[in-house]
Swiss-Prot record:
PROSITE patterns in the cross-refs: ADENYLOSUCCIN_SYN_1, ADENYLOSUCCIN_SYN_2
A GO CC term assigned to this protein in UniProt: cytoplasm
Species of origin: Micrococcus luteus (strain ATCC 4698 / DSM 20030 / JCM 1464 / CCM 169 / CCUG 5858 / IAM 1056 / NBRC 3333 / NCIMB 9278 / NCTC 2665 / VKM Ac-2230) (Micrococcus lysodeikticus)
Active-site residues, as the UniProt record annotates them: 13 (proton acceptor), 41 (proton donor)
Pathway per the UniProt entry: Purine metabolism; AMP biosynthesis via de novo pathway; AMP from IMP: step 1/2
Keywords: Cytoplasm, GTP-binding, Ligase, Magnesium, Metal-binding, Nucleotide-binding, Purine biosynthesis
Protein name: Adenylosuccinate synthetase
Function: Plays an important role in the de novo pathway of purine nucleotide biosynthesis. Catalyzes the first committed step in the biosynthesis of AMP from IMP.
Length: 429
């Protein structure tokens, strides 16, 4: 059975955890291929809310093996806090597997992240301050520390020493902070070695063997398309590639092994942090979407910026990722709105653009061109078939499907794991 990828189509917080949880009972492996504990997702099981960051949502599916892939950057302190939190609520994490090649977030990465943001002032990106960007920087600069390194103290110390030559120069001379010692960082990592060891695997062979055996492997992407370092709203992006191509790299699975690539997209749009946002709302309607949709960061509690659905972005995301299906989430949040605007094009300096502008400068100046759709007042939280939805809700979904260039195969109508309208099967056609 080929692999399946789940990818955010906007700026994150689209409901990827809900999609993973929906499919979790039917897959054998759930893989987190990228990111770190900088992005969270919420899953509701039997009315109980779980907020996950490093752990894949598949950790809550007893029949699926959760895997943290080689493309993830792992904060060990945060990882074990999350594990302990789940286990205290009766959910075992003994089946968790972690790639030996995943990179580790060191305490100095978090320090660098925070002081750099302060140093940038008004030009700050708006990171979570959890050290994700600096960890990826070290990975690319070949100064990183990987999971496998903490099981050999001599190698670990050599790598820490190499990294600190650069870090201490910056911390002391540029940021006026104290120097970090090899001993304190080594002690930090070694303190987790014994507990971590049973979880560590060769994830590439594990997952490819599973595919060879006909197992279903689900990639649960973090962040989203427009936070991708190559395809997102640069420089207001993350440090990895949370697109479908990045999922393949972050799990060590070849692109030809994917049968479905599912884009997760909200029925409206949200964003956290700085950066352009053409459909952003600054009025009472923006606050209504934020309040009704519970649009506050899982990690930071920061209120999310809110706006209308952007079909231009959705169409471009479908192209970048090669989406086979869209999973439309939070349609219920729009209930009660008389007229629902959808962005169908942009106007930049008086010129209409039906596609994404080529440059970020143009996108930053883009003004949305809206088409209005009639809303509905009926409660849709109990809908389970497409025909259960009010006609105006059906028309809205059909319009988004046409404008976004990708079929909508599932629709979220509430926070519960079962509050989904499945138009077609997401694993098998």
């Amino acid at each position: 059975m080929p692999a399946i990828a789940i990818v955010g189509a906007q700026w994150g917080d689209e409901g990827k955890g809900k999609a993973t949880d929906l499919l979790g009972g039917r897959v054998d492996y759930v893989v987190k291929p990228n990111g770190g504990n900088n992005a969270g997702h919420t899953v509701v099981v039997n009315g109980e809310k779980f907020e996950l960051k490093l752990l894949p949502a598949g950790i809550l599916s007893p029949n699926a093996v959760p895997v943290i892939g080689n493309g993830v950057v792992v904060n060990l302190e945060a990882l074990f806090e999350e594990i302990d939190g789940l286990e205290s609520r009766g959910h075992s994490c003994e089946h968790l597997k972690i790639s030996a090649n995943a990179h580790l977030v060191a305490p100095y990465h978090q320090t660098m992240d925070k002081v750099t943001e302060r140093f940038l002032g008004q030009r700050a990106i708006g990171t979570t301050g959890r050290g994700i960007g600096p960890t990826y920087m070290d990975k690319v600069a070949r100064l990183g520390i990987r999971v496998q390194d903490i099981f050999d103290e001599s190698i670990l110390r050599q790598k820490i020493e190499g990294a600190l030559r650069q870090k201490n120069e910056l911390l002391v001379k540029l940021y006026n902070r104290r120097a970090v010692t090899v001993d304190e960082i080594a002690e930090y990592f070694l303190g987790y070695a014994d507990r971590l060891r049973p979880m560590v695997v060769d994830s590439v062979n594990l997952l490819n063997d599973a595919l060879d055996e006909g197992k279903v492997v689900l990639m649960e992407g973090g962040q989203a398309t427009y936070l991708d370092v190559d395809h997102g709203t640069y420089p207001f992006v993350t440090s990895s590639n949370p697109t479908a191509g990045g999922a393949a790299v972050g799990a060590g699975i070849g692109p030809t092994r994917f049968s479905r690539t599912i884009g997760i997209v909200k029925a409206y749009t949200t964003r956290v942090g700085a950066g352009p946002f053409p459909t952003e709302l600054f009025d009472e309607m923006g606050e209504q979407l934020r309040t009704t949709g519970g649009e506050f960061g899982v990690n930071t509690g920061r209120p999310r910026r809110t706006g209308w659905y952007d079909a231009v972005m959705a169409h471009y995301a479908a192209r970048i990722n090669g989406f086979t299906d869209y999973f439309l989430t939070k349609l219920d949040v729009l209930t009660g709105i008389e007229k629902i605007p959808v962005c169908v094009a942009y106007e930049v300096d008086g010129v209409r653009h039906d596609r994404m502008p080529m440059t970020q400068t143009e996108f930053h100046h883009a003004k949305p061109v809206y088409e209005l759709f009639d809303g509905w007042t009926e409660d849709i939280s109990g809908a389970r078939a497409f025909t259960d939805l009010p006609l105006n809700a059906q028309h809205y979904v059909e319009a988004l499907e046409k404008l976004s260039g990708c079929r909508i195969s599932a629709i979220g109508v509430g926070p519960g794991r079962d509050q989904v309208v499945q138009v077609r099967d997401l694993i098998q056609d």
